[in-house]
């Protein structure tokens, strides 16, 4: 048995040619997935402070708990951004450290807006779900709020051009909730996803305000464009969903099309063309084609 173990260790310790081709050059430290997950937890503790810290009515004590989380957040995010920069570029460690400090502070400066947006998402989810008994239930347990917390954090980092980390964050939410939102997607305020499992929102999707999706909705690409050398081009290829649109379960909206404001897209619809405002796109009514009493068979 020991010989088998030693043999496997020896083989696995050697880098394969394919493995070498996937590794970054040099020996730069790589982002730490558990630390990135902790970043999200700290942001959640700050934004939903009364729910995830000891609830304190006095502002001074509340500020203390937020401050403790904020200090840890800055240090951790600073370190992980630096690792991400080193992982994806030819920066020196000193250059990466300087840039990471600036980016971490920039992110923290944007936290009030992240908080504002997330509270609109909580309100939209609560108001749109008669099964929700209170706001706390939504914040603590709803998959859409878990996914949107991850997405709102990741989107800010994506706009700041932080490499790797935004995608790690949204894929952590994907694993937790079954909701797949690319950090590059643009999503307005008062956004809700009921149930959530199986929802996919692609990188270049644009979603307006007061939009509601149900489980299984895909906002995806219909086809891909290629350059002269056969490489896929990263161009807008996902839908634009305007304000006050509801998309019901398992609808697939594909390509760079626009769903006009105040529209309803029914369940199990396959849509690849523009829809004007105030539209209702529904399936044809089911037709009963059975034979009465078995006659005619």
PLM feature segments, named:
Residues 1-168, 295-297:
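Terminal amphipathic alpha-helical/low-complexity segments used for targeting or macromolecular assembly
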Residues 173-289:
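Structural signal for interior beta-strand "rungs" in well-ordered beta-sheet cores
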């Amino acid at each position: 048995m020991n010989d088998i173990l030693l043999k496997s260790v020896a083989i696995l310790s050697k880098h394969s040619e394919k493995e070498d081709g996937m590794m970054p050059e040099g020996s730069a430290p790589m982002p730490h997935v558990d630390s990135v997950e902790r970043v999200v937890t700290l942001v959640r503790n700050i934004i939903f402070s009364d729910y995830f810290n000891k609830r304190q009515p006095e502002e001074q004590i509340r500020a203390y708990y937020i401050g403790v989380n904020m200090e840890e957040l800055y240090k951790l995010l600073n370190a992980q951004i630096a690792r991400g920069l080193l992982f994806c570029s030819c920066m020196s460690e000193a250059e990466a450290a300087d840039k990471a400090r600036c980016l971490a502070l920039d992110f923290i400066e944007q936290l009030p807006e992240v908080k504002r947006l997330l509270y609109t998402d909580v309100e939209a989810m609560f108001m749109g779900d008669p099964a929700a008994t209170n706001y706390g239930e939504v914040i603590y347990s709803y998959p859409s709020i878990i996914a949107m917390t991850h997405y709102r954090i990741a989107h800010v980092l994506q706009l700041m051009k932080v490499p790797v980390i935004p995608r790690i964050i949204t894929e952590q939410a994907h694993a937790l909730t079954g909701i797949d939102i690319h950090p590059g997607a643009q999503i307005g305020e008062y956004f809700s996803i009921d149930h959530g499992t199986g929802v996919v929102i692609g990188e270049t999707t644009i979603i307006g305000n007061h939009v509601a999706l149900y489980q299984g909705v895909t906002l995806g690409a219909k086809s891909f464009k290629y350059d002269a050398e056969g490489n896929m081009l990263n161009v807008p290829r996902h839908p634009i969903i305007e304000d006050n649109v509801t998309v019901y379960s398992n609808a697939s909206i594909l390509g760079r099309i626009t769903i006009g404001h105040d529209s309803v897209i029914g369940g199990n619809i396959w849509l690849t063309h523009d829809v004007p405002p105030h539209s209702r796109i529904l399936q044809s009514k089911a037709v009963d084609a059975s034979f009465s009493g078995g006659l005619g068979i």
